[in-house]
Amino acid sequence: MAVKTLKDLLAEGVEGRHVLVRSDLNVPLADGEITDPGRIDASIPTLRALLDEGARVIVAAHLGRPKGEVDPELSLAPVAEALAERLDQWVPLAGDVTGEDAHERANGLDDGDILLLENVRFDPRETSKDASERAEFAAELAELTADNGAFVSDGFGVVHREQASVYDVAKKLPSYAGGLVSAELEVLEKVSGAPEAPYAVVLGGSKVSDKLGVIEALAPKVDRLIIGGGMCFTFLAAQGHDVGGSLLQEDMIDTCKDLLERYGDVIVLPTDVVAAENFSKDAEHKAVGLSEIPSGWMGLDIGPESADAFAAVLGEAKTVFWNGPMGVFEFPAFAAGTKAVAEAIIKATDAGAFSVVGGGDSAAAVRTLGLDEKGFSHISTGGGASLEFLEGKTLPGVEVLG
């Protein structure tokens, strides 16, 4: 699909033009402070390129799930500060999304100025299931660009959503894929097209149901499919193991049995786990074999034997895609499995493998555990979007650019 890109827009010329950029600035906050600025950092190159060429940039983004109403705790104010720091220029925050203040500020922009709109999800039309409501909101966003405006889609973490500021607005303005979206698509096409073998995929996270589509899509294509995290316990139960009080999707056991029957030679499961008495960072815990989980205890990480086995598989890989932690990495006692897998991927990358971290919790884990982000070939900013792409689904926010 031929999609116009940021390079095309810059070649056409942006000096004096209002350019609406949909960025993904949905960062985690704790007490109003940004705890992981990864997505903000990833948005900077596209914004910088436009500003340097004299564009009048208007940024649309969301934060959290405010349910279509104003929530001061989900204001983009901390994000405006973080952008200003990184761009080394003032980034004013509009007091609304498409209201009087946004219009006034947008009209007052000079060449090379930037404006951040307030959280687009403060307006219920952004995420409405009613296409006419979304179209109405998209038209209001487009109006902010005055005459000769343009739209740049640069929020890869939201391109799988059919939302007003992602999808509908692209129908109202000349539209382009931003540098980040272009780079993300290029990387994912590389791992989904003809990846160099052996190709190993690591999937973690809590629910099998969330990853079923990607398991079905990837299992026939990969050499090894490593499964850890909370979702592994439903697979282990399907093998007949008693998983104690571990996270279990009973309605998915038969599905896991079927997957193991079809792809048992590809799927790699843990052989030991770190079990805990309860779900807390200070819980009593120990590494045990699969038949030794104490009654009522729950597995909160893969065990050391499994970590070594997973690392051995990854050591032979030439292409690696990783999405989802191996355990509750937020608790130090249950972070070892995730760290071991991440370090094995870094080692494989150093030996020449092409590695992609599929956004979401995996990217957060890399940063939380203090690992070198440059040790991976690519860290995606979009967990859900990258999974849907690998499932073979169309991404509405990309398709609409074509």
Curated annotation (Swiss-Prot):
ATP binds at residues 211, 299, 330, 359-362. Pathway: Carbohydrate degradation; glycolysis; pyruvate from D-glyceraldehyde 3-phosphate: step 2/5. It catalyses: (2R)-3-phosphoglycerate + ATP = (2R)-3-phospho-glyceroyl phosphate + ADP. It is an enzyme of class 2 (transferase). The keyword NAD does not apply. Transmembrane segments: none annotated. Pfam families: PGK (PF00162). GO terms for biological process: gluconeogenesis; glycolytic process. Substrate binds at residues 24-26, 39, 62-65, 121, 161. InterPro entries: Phosphoglycerate_kinase (IPR001576), Phosphoglycerate_kinase_CS (IPR015911), Phosphoglycerate_kinase_N (IPR015824), Phosphoglycerate_kinase_sf (IPR036043). It is found in: Cytoplasm. Its EC number is 2.7.2.3. The keyword Ribosomal protein does not apply. One of its GO terms (molecular function) is ATP binding. GO terms for cellular component: cytosol. Keywords: ATP-binding, Cytoplasm, Glycolysis, Kinase, Nucleotide-binding, Transferase. Belongs to the phosphoglycerate kinase family. Monomer. This is Phosphoglycerate kinase. It comes from Corynebacterium urealyticum (strain ATCC 43042 / DSM 7109). The gene is pgk.
